[in-house]
């Protein structure tokens, strides 16, 4: 009986340790820190997207929704209400399309852009009232440790 309990305890401890290690890995790999510009008013909860367009695509947000071989890598999380200067992080725990994990992203040069989808009536990244960042050209690698920082500075007019 004692051996059975000891075996169960060790197995449980190993599982907890493995999960903690995996959680730590998600914080160490490629991640995006998106903040709300201090000049903007507080925002309600919404869907936060980061679009990564390879090559010379200057406005990645306009590529959201493409599928198949032309699909643009996009990360998404449900964002809490944001105060000016506050933000959210998108990392390996975020939903990603068209890949299964962010680790599958091919290293290279990308234009990246953040979009905060707030319009509940029109579910489109280009909907009036949504916020977005300026595009940023950056070298991305799934193994990089330094975060990519983006600031939501613009609003799509109503």
Where are the model-predicted features located?
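Bacterial N-terminal signal peptides
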Residues: 5-15
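Boundary at the C-terminal end of the N-terminal hydrophobic targeting segment
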Residues: 15-23
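Short amphipathic, basic-aromatic surface patches that mediate peripheral association
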Residues: 32-41, 54-60
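Contiguous segments within soluble domain cores/interaction surfaces
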Residues: 48-85
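Short acidic/polar inter-strand loop motif in beta-rich domains
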Residues: 56-59, 116-132
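A beta-strand/beta-hairpin structural motif
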Residues: 79-101
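A short tyrosine-centered beta-strand micro-motif
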Residues: 105-119
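Short beta-strand elements
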Residues: 124-158
């Amino acid at each position: 009986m004692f051996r059975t309990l000891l075996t169960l305890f060790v197995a449980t401890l190993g599982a907890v340790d493995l999960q903690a290690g995996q959680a730590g890995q998600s914080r160490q790999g490629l991640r995006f820190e998106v903040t709300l510009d201090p000049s903007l008013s507080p925002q309600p909860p919404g869907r936060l997207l980061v679009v990564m367009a390879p090559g010379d695509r200057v406005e990645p947000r306009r590529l959201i929704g493409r599928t198949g071989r032309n699909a643009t890598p996009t990360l998404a999380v449900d964002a809490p209400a944001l105060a000016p200067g506050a933000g959210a992080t998108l990392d390996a725990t975020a939903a990603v399309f068209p890949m299964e994990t962010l680790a599958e992203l091919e290293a290279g040069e990308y234009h990246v852009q953040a979009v905060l989808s707030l319009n509940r009536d029109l579910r489109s990244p280009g909907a009036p009232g949504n916020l977005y960042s300026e595009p940023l050209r950056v070298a991305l690698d799934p193994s990089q440790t330094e975060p990519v920082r983006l600031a939501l500075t613009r609003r799509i007019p109503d």
